[in-house]
């Protein structure tokens, strides 16, 4: 209703614009002593008509951002009242492990955990179910029905191991939380990094570390199988890395050659009331320089990731073996591999699902009840 009035294209917006005009007139018509307060909400303030936010109309704006760790804890406690949770479930622990979650995401987390518990006839929801629910939300649902050959599993394991090793060793990178070669969503495998806290901003060093990590999966395939046998699994990694590198140059001022200047501007769609004309903000020479700077950033981080993997080929092979054997490894196994120590099985590995359910029931019944870098294959999308 409050969308910005357009440039007259489409022909189907006349009634909507007349409604907006009438609302603006009515809001102007309120006298000062009527005591009428008009409240509205939107998750797209960028498309609002400027007339709506002028003084005398919606002139007070309250931004409701994502909850911090304390807010997430309180939200989780509210939703956890609706399910029977075990005593080992700690809302603060879950809150620390869910940075960037919205209130709806947290509600979904509790619901998914309850569903996992119900599928194995458990009376209470334990931390195991919450971890499974978190993995499903963060990395997508498991596709156990997808059959992968031994060669595909090995290739995916090397790819994900490359991400994990470089992400573990580059400076100021988010810690590696979990690596899996079980197909999830549209990905053949996932390496999930979990931030240690809420991130407000990110430094150039962190961005470059992320670039090295994104290219590490492709590089691992290159080092093991040769350049001619690299798969299409790194397509999404390349897309994300290229966007980061270009934004570093054109928006965030991380290029010494071009300086802290904005070289791109999102003018928006004409159907949202933006101008039909497309302005050119740079010369052809500047555009060429931007491309050169983007390539330079990518090349130096590509080279760094390659050097790290060459220096740690023994860890790459060992992590591949662990992934092929266990399919999913967690922080403890990753730390053991990086320290070149023997690998212990991950939690819950080696027990049939029925035994796991029976064991969980026997433990929870004794207590009183009281909360990615992906390897994608374009041909499977």
Curated annotation (Swiss-Prot):
> What Gene Ontology cellular-component terms does the record carry?
plasma membrane
Q: Where is the composition biased (Polar residues)?
A: 353-366
Where is Zn(2+) annotated to bind? 159, 163, 237
Pfam short name (any one): Peptidase_M41
State the Gene Ontology BP annotations. protein catabolic process; proteolysis
InterPro entries given in the database record? AAA_lid_3 (IPR041569), ATPase_AAA_core (IPR003959), ATPase_AAA_CS (IPR003960), P-loop_NTPase (IPR027417), Peptidase_M41 (IPR000642), Peptidase_M41-like (IPR037219)
Q: Which UniProt keywords apply?
A: Hydrolase, Metal-binding, Metalloprotease, Protease, Zinc
Name the cofactor(s): Zn(2+)
Protein's recorded name: ATP-dependent zinc metalloprotease FtsH homolog
Q: Which organism is it from?
A: Haemophilus influenzae (strain ATCC 51907 / DSM 11121 / KW20 / Rd)
For region Disordered, the annotated ranges are: 339-381
Tell me the cofactor note: Binds 1 zinc ion per subunit.
Q: Which family is annotated?
A: In the N-terminal section; belongs to the AAA ATPase family. In the C-terminal section; belongs to the peptidase M41 family.
Q: Which PROSITE patterns match?
A: AAA (PS00674)
């Amino acid at each position: 209703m409050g969308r910005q009035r357009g440039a007259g294209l489409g022909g189907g917006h006349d009634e909507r614009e007349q409604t907006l005009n009438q609302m603006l007139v009515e809001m102007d018509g309120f006298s000062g002593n009527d005591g009428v307060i008009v409240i509205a909400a939107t998750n797209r303030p960028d498309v609002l008509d400027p007339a709506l936010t002028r003084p005398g109309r919606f002139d007070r704006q309250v931004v409701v951002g994502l909850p911090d760790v304390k807010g997430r804890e309180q939200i989780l406690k509210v939703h956890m009242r609706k399910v029977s949770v075990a005593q080992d479930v700690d809302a603060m622990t879950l809150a620390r492990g869910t940075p960037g979650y919205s209130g709806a995401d947290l509600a979904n987390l509790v619901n998914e955990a309850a569903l996992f518990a119900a599928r194995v006839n458990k009376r209470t929801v334990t931390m195991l179910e919450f971890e499974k629910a978190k993995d499903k939300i963060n990395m997508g649902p498991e596709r156990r029905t997808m059959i992968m050959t031994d060669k595909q599993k090995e290739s995916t394991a090397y790819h994900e191991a490359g991400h994990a090793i470089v992400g573990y060793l580059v400076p100021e990178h988010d810690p590696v939380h979990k690596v899996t070669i079980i197909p999830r969503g549209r990905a053949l495998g996932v390496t999930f990094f979990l931030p240690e806290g809420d991130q407000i901003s990110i430094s150039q060093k962190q961005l470059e570390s992320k670039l090295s990590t994104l290219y590490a999966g492709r590089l691992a395939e290159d080092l093991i199988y040769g350049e001619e046998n690299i798969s299409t699994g790194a397509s999404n990694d390349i897309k994300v890395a290229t966007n980061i590198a270009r934004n570093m140059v054109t928006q965030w001022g991380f290029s010494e050659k071009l300086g802290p200047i904005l070289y791109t501007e999102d003018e928006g769609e004409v159907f949202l009331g933006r101008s039909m004309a497309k302005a050119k903000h740079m010369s052809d020479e500047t555009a060429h320089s931007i491309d050169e700077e983007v390539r330079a950033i990518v090349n130096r981080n590509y080279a760094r990731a390659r050097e790290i993997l060459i220096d740690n080929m023994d860890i790459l092979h060992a992590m591949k073996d662990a992934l092929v054997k266990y399919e999913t490894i967690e922080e403890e196994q990753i730390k053991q591999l990086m320290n070149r120590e023997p690998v212990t099985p991950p939690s819950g590995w080696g027990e049939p699902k029925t035994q796991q359910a029976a064991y969980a029931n026997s433990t929870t019944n004794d207590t009183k009840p009281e909360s990615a870098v992906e390897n994608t294959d374009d041909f499977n999308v």
